[in-house]
Amino acid sequence: MPKYPFVEEEFETVRTIIRERASISRYGDGELRCAIDGSCSSQKGDPKLAEKLRRILKNDIKGLLVGIPRSVERYDWAMYNSKKAGSWVKYRTHRFGSLLDPSKKYYSSFITRSDNAFHINCKQYWDLCKVMWDKRNVVFIQGEEKPIAKTKDLFGNISSSKIIIGPSHHAFDEYEKIKNEAKKHYEKNVLFILALGAAATVLACDIHLDGYQALDLGHMGAFYGNIFKEKPGLEKIEKEAISNDQIYNKELYK
């Protein structure tokens, strides 16, 4: 079995993003399946997507963190969801291990998943997360069905926000449209927060290469809302899917 590389823990992953104003591309089980020419529930297989995902896993791009699952052998799984341990072991086999650079330092993809990392289920952790976007002009790029931006308390400390709505399923099919829409918002102090499945993993890298910070934070809003029982705090939004060649941009908070 290939040697599993070092993966930084969740608190330190967030601290690194804050300290270095780094971007992050994250891999969960769906992205890993897509990287080996497979598919997942939200994204059908695509050779171009698979190639991009594989390349990012071994990249040496300054300021871009790559998040992967933590090893079930290297770390104390009392802090994690042991029910999923078998799943990560499967991806450590020849199907997945060969995609990684054993000498590269990786970061945790569990930073948004308190169902995987039980110890981040605390106010201290979520307060730390809020520092990542404190007083920033945020552009959310998200799917229509599970909008990360709906958790108003989580993002209540940002300066301004706009939203780009993409497809909740098979978003990579509309990748160029989504990326071109993101480029319209390139400006000083902008931060992109992405929740768009496997498409977000590669989009975070592309936005970073253009010189802007991008955080792939899918599932974060849902788990924060579950923990703090937050109800959606936004007014009703009329959304148009990007697949219909219409993008919806709106100030969410003032």
Language model regions located:
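Electropositive, gly/pro-rich neighborhoods at or near active sites that engage anionic ligands
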Residues: 1-155
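Catalytic phosphate/metal-binding cores of nucleic-acid and nucleotide-processing enzymes, i.e., regions
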Residues: 2-7, 16, 47, 62-64, ...
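A short, acidic, amphipathic alpha-helical segment used as a generic capping/interface helix at domain edges
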Residues: 8-10, 48-55, 173-184, 190, ...
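Residues at the C-termini of beta-strands that transition into short coil/loop
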Residues: 70, 165, 218
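Structural motif
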Residues: 137, 190-191
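A mid-sequence, solvent-exposed acidic-amphipathic segment
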Residues: 145-189
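C-terminal functional extensions of proteins
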Residues: 199-254
